Amino acid sequence: MSNDDTYKAFASRPHLVIVGAGATIDSIPNGDKNGQQSAVMKGFIDKLGFTGILADSGIQFDSDNLEDIYSTLAERNDCTYVREKLETEIFNYFSSLEIPDTITKYDLLILSLTRKDCIATFNWDGLLVDAYRRMLKITDNLPQMLFLHGNVKVGYCTKCGNYGYHTYCCPRCHTPFAQSKLLFPIRHKNYNNNTFIKTQWDIFEDFLSNAAIVTIYGYSAPKTDVEAIEKLKSAFIRITQDRYFDQIQIIERPGFNRNDISSAWEDLSTYIHGHLEIKESFFDTYLAEFPRRSVEGYTKRNIAGWWGSSNKTFEKEKGTNYTLKELAMHISPLLTSDPFDSLSLKTL
């Protein structure tokens, strides 16, 4: 294979973005359309006002982490009522979240990728789904979406396996979609028990094994989620060829200590010769520097030795201050151009 063939083969690989609860919080810093907040696992019950439900259990919980609390309830037969009530309230709460009318980082994230790429979310809220539907007004060349713990706004066909917006019907057999179940945070998860969840993970593992760039946005890979971490590692090393040029970028809060990074991400970085970067903002990543051309831009710079800069970016100074029309106009040159043409990648 010639150098040019190697270059093009690398550039054609997907970009995978793994999304956790921190991404939703970052995307709606002032709350959703109605001012409602999301939450991470730690402090989840208190922040979202569910402490009254737990009082009915009569248990004194030593932890404020939802996974610890829910696992305790799941292990006790005398807490079935409380557990089911908590599940219902969580589902209803996340179903009530609505994306703001203004553009969010989720909109930019979705628009920064194309159909060869993938966003895999652990989140229950439907804000990514809302953003995806909004970006369809600009283009239908958008990334594949995967829901690793289910989602309140996603349904699936029990016959054909297709999935989509929860109120839609299967495009093949026209059966109304069944609501995807939420995978609640017990200590020992089984990702194979639910057909929909299993299929989502199968597709996710394929993307992870092939991705040239993996961006981790607001997901900490908690040590307690042993099954997920094992799946991540096994999928990442499935392809045996050298992943020397592959890249991991982690979006973390400003001032994040590199020493606090999840051991799961450090382990993965050993297979790509330490190519792991911590970024303080979405706007510092390849997604924002080379929207819709992230792998192509990364390849041209780091493999082809290009010293240029991107002609179209999502700039930190501009942030999310676009109207939908302005965003469509800003990105329009990248909707029809070749990945390597002068509109998207200019030389100095």
Question: Which residues does each PLM region occupy?
Answer:
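Gly/serine-rich nucleotide phosphate-binding loop at the start of the catalytic core
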Residues: 1-117, 122-128, 340-348
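SIR2/sirtuin-family catalytic core signature
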Residues: 1-19, 25-27, 203-348
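Conserved beta-strand scaffold positions in the cores of enzyme catalytic domains, especially
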Residues: 119, 145-147, 280
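Cys/His-rich short segments
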Residues: 147-195
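Short, solvent-exposed loop/turn segments at secondary-structure junctions
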Residues: 22-25, 30-32, 124-127, 151-154, ...
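A short alpha->loop->secondary-structure connector
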Residues: 135-146
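Short active-site loop/helix that positions an aromatic residue
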Residues: 126-136
